[in-house]
């Protein structure tokens, strides 16, 4: 389950930002996990909630958007929607596809409380 490792990386980014920007906690975290990025969104949410205790993420609302996959078909030279990796081109049925969208995993934005108390 690589989602736990990804959640740890996201939490580290948030903790680093909290120290640097001097905010106390995240109240809303918005992520984007494209349909082609290879992340199970429910598992990522579970992992984030599981490791949030005692951190700036504890109690935060976590929203994860899942943009659709898009690809360029090298056989029929067309942009096509792609529901999952390994799916054929919806136009020609070919498999020579270059993903162009839906592969991202990123922090979109966050809402924070700025009651900073240095340790």
Swiss-Prot record:
Coiled coil: none
Keyword Zinc found: yes
Signal peptide positions on this chain: none
Binding locations of Zn(2+): 73, 76, 89, 92
Keyword check for Transmembrane: no
InterPro entries registered for this protein in UniProt: Hydgase_Ni_incorp_HypA/HybF_CS (IPR020538), HypA/HybF (IPR000688)
GO biological process, one term: protein maturation
Cysteine-cysteine disulfides: none
Residues annotated as binding Ni(2+): 2
Swiss-Prot/TrEMBL keywords: Metal-binding, Nickel, Plasmid, Zinc
GO molecular function, one term: nickel cation binding
PANTHER family, per the entry: HYDROGENASE MATURATION FACTOR HYPA
Protein role: Involved in the maturation of [NiFe] hydrogenases. Required for nickel insertion into the metal center of the hydrogenase.
Similarity annotation: Belongs to the HypA/HybF family.
Record protein name field: Hydrogenase maturation factor HypA
